[in-house]
Swiss-Prot record:
GO cellular component, one term: cytoplasm
Family according to the record: Belongs to the JMJD6 family.
One of the protein's GO biological processes: positive regulation of translational termination
Cofactors demanded by this protein: Fe(2+)
A Pfam family per the record: JmjC
Main localization (coarse): nucleus
Protein name (record): 2-oxoglutarate and iron-dependent oxygenase JMJD4 homolog
Amino acid sequence: MASEERDGDVLLQLHPEEVVETDPQLPEEIERCSGLDYNDFFWRYMHKNIPVIIANVSNDWECQNWTVGQSSPESRDLNSNPSASSINFDYLKTKISDGPVPVANCNSSYFNSHTKLELNFHDYLAKWRSSIESQSSAAWTSAEVNSNVAPASGDNLYLKDWHLAAQMPGYNFYKVPKYFASDWLNEQLIQQGKDDYRFVYMGPKNSWTSYHADVFGSFSWSTNIVGLKKWLIMPPGEELKLNDRLGNLPFSIDEKMLDEHNVRYYTINQRANEAVFVPSGWFHQVWNLTDTISVNHNWFNGCNISMVWQNLKNNLKAVCNEISDCQQMDNFEAHCQTMLRASFGINYLDFIELLEFIAARRLAEGTVATKFLLFDSYTMNDYHVQYDLECLWKITRTLTEDPTIQCSPLQLEDRCQGLLARLEF
């Protein structure tokens, strides 16, 4: 059943899974869907941790004005391959205030990462525009779709991980698609005014993102506003075939490398107005085959919260091993948690506080008349709220059995037991 309009917001209709698959099979290729309803996306892709491409998600977004084309977003061919003049630099400069933005130089690396720098946004636009005009970029051809981008000489500057939505909260340049609205991570961070995981990426042809899996083992989604991206993406576990003798993963991959190591992988050619859903633990690398702008989120919810917890535990173990020679020091466990937060982004206390926050809101759904709005647009039906509460109960029960939590001087077990008591039903 499709999401329903109610009092100006959209109701996320979730219903019990009709056919329970204990061992979901990987698809032969990544599906491209249009008109997918929320319930189907939830059970067919998100719950099974399977990627999908969803078309026609950004037709009415304000940021369609960031592109140069026909007279209105509705009349443009959003899936056409853009020319060098596709970026509306004048509109971007007028609409978005100047200020520092994070930039990666894709032609320079430092400790297995692209070199990072900071530029003022308007300076970045000027450099990008000048590069297009001076290079007279060759037209996109279909032959490029099946070949990786060859690095050019000089700087190759990619504006990445820009918190534009947080920086300009009054500028509603996009709307979170309904498929991705169940987002525990950003629900908490936005409400509490903390750094979130909502990003804008802008980059020229030949810019790219190196081989990685997403932060926390989270889901991610990426919607192209303009441009064409190529993805190489693989199911969890396949990345182990690429480890060197020290267990290190490569910085960059290509089809030849993957074929030589017998890696199962998929190729995605993502067009404008399409969203790619990236499940937890799927390693990937992405190339911009044309000048490209995208909106991206990292997030997790009841479908993958257990994977995030497992990654958190694994990273704590790695931290403890790294400083194992300091085990006799006072507050060793607390020091490990501090290092865990620094390296992983959250620690055990942060994770429990997030569970407490989401639980409080879902429990309130059953006791107050007003529903909480997700991203100012969406509410959950009763079954969806119940599903979230059941997932919260299961993961909290798992936490109470963890030795680190049981022995924590921060009384983490007491907090988990208290949360578990509130979730009993």
